[in-house]
Structure formats: C-alpha cells, structure tokens
Design a protein with these regions (language model features):
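Extreme N-terminal starter segment of soluble prokaryotic enzymes
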Residues: 1-6
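Flexible, gly/pro- and Lys/Arg-enriched active-site loops
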Residues: 8-41, 46-160
Length: 160
C-alpha cells in the first residue's frame, strides 16, 4: 500500500522558496532530508528538479519522478509524468515523498498521510509558500535543532 508523505522546510510565515531556490542553507536539514528520503521514491515538479544543483540530479539512491505539463521535457535518470495522479500510479507500494514545489505540495496535501516539516523559527522573504497544514493533522514527533543563527524543529505530523 502506498503512503504519501510531504517533506518540506517552511518558515514561520509559510515561505518555502525564493527566486527558484531555498531562502536558507541548512546543512543539517539537507542531511535530514537525504536520510529520510533515501531508498524511497521522490516526486517533484519540474522547477524543483531544475533547482537542484546539477551534480545532485537526479537525487541519488532514490527513484525520481518529475511532474510537468511540458510533454517534450526530458531529464536523464528520471520518470516524467504529466500530473500528480500519474506519478502516484507509478509509485507502487511503500512510502513516497513529495518534495516540492508549491503547486505540487498544494495538489498532494489532500492525499498525504504524513508530513515531515522542518519548522524554521524565522520569517523570511520569498515567493513560494506551503499550504496551511495545522487543521487535520496531529504531531507525532518533534526534535528541536539549532544550526548557526537558525533555530528550527524537525516535526512529523500524521493525518488525524
């Protein structure tokens, strides 16, 4: 059976992206992301895929599925699909991670079973936001962390 999980780092004001990238560089959070998603399928939008540094594309040790409306788009080492439903059909059983961006998160929120949220204790400027997620979810794990000037919590929510 498939379990759909969203994994995201989000500022207090909902921001998750700025000008095609992340508004922060958090090495420990990137390691958490890699450790959590390794060995699983990851689903992302084309812009998210293209925002990943080229040397890390496709994300290693994971099946990469990219959702795009551009039927001619191609990238080596990834499965390309036209919509989120098609992506879910390709996933098979096990936990699949939706990793962004904003449009894909909004579409996947209603089918998600679990959220892995890095809640950053700051408000930042940005142009991509994560959909509201407090209602309908219960917190099952919280681990506080500090990295330089950044304070954040790794939080896991399950649908209530």
């Amino acid at each position: 059976m498939i379990m759909v999980s969203l994994i995201v780092a989000v500022a207090r004001n909902g921001v998750i992206g700025r000008q095609g990238g992340l508004p922060w560089h958090l090495r420990d959070d990137m390691k958490y992301f890699a450790d959590t998603t390794r060995g699983h399928t990851v689903v992302m939008g084309r812009k998210t895929f293209e925002s990943i540094p080229e040397k890390y594309r496709p994300l290693p040790d994971r099946r990469n599925i990219v959702v795009t409306r551009d039927t001619s788009w191609f990238a080596k080492g990834v499965d390309v699909v036209g919509d989120l439903g098609e992506a879910m059909e390709k996933c098979g059983d096990g936990e699949v991670f939706v990793i962004g961006g904003g449009e894909i998160y909004a579409q996947a929120m209603h089918v998600a079973d679990r959220l892995y949220v890095t809640e950053i204790a700051a408000e930042v400027e940005g142009d991509v936001v994560f959909p509201p997620y407090i209602v309908g979810w219960r917190e099952v794990k919280r681990v506080p962390h500090q990295e330089g000037e950044w304070r954040y919590d790794w939080v896991v929510y399950e649908r209530s």
